[in-house]
Amino acid sequence: MLAVYTLSVSFAPGASVLPGSRVVSRNAALSMEVKPVVIGVAADSGCGKSTFMRRLTSIFGGESKLLDIGRETNTLVSDMTTVICLDDYHKWDRTGRKSNPEWPDGITALHEACQKWDKMAQDVTDLKAGKTVDKPIYNHITGELDPDETVSPTPIVIFEGLHPMHDERVNAALDLSVYLDITDDVKF
């Protein structure tokens, strides 16, 4: 069986990870007063986004762990990176998607109409500006929308999910866009 992986990467005009072109140590980079680099990673369900995020986080240093808020969360954090799962920006919980009057036959969470685009755009913009945000949580276990969690920016902030480049405001705030295209026989 031949597995085909395609990785498409694009940089926003003028984007840079660190000021200038000099190489600095990890500790020096952490102490620099720079705005976070914001990365969007898009891929279909089952393509390995979460696995890719854990490995990417380990490359940038630090062990990724779930944000410790005493309940279920999808947010991975380390000294250098914060990974935010865009599932957290679902507009409705599982029950709401099944019984929504706008969608009498129900609607899947994968549909673009099921996303909180305004909140997502505001959080991306605020984190890029170095501000702390209170972001929603979609609980995959219960299918409910849990109370918000507080997320502080790190030098690298990654938004991963199906649609990080769909909304013009979110896409404009991304310094780097990555699309993972995995063949169906490799997924899951």
Named regions from a protein language model:
Residues 1-21:
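N-terminal chloroplast transit peptides
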Residues 44:
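P-loop (Walker A) phosphate-binding loop of NTP-binding proteins
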Residues 47:
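ATP-binding Walker
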Residues 50:
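Walker A/P-loop
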Residues 62-94:
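Short beta-strand-centered segment that lines the nucleotide-binding/catalytic pocket of NTP-utilizing
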Residues 82-85, 89-142:
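Conserved nucleotide-sensing/catalytic segment adjacent to the nucleotide-binding pocket
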Residues 146-188:
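ATP-dependent NMP and nucleoside kinases share a basic, alpha-helical "lid"
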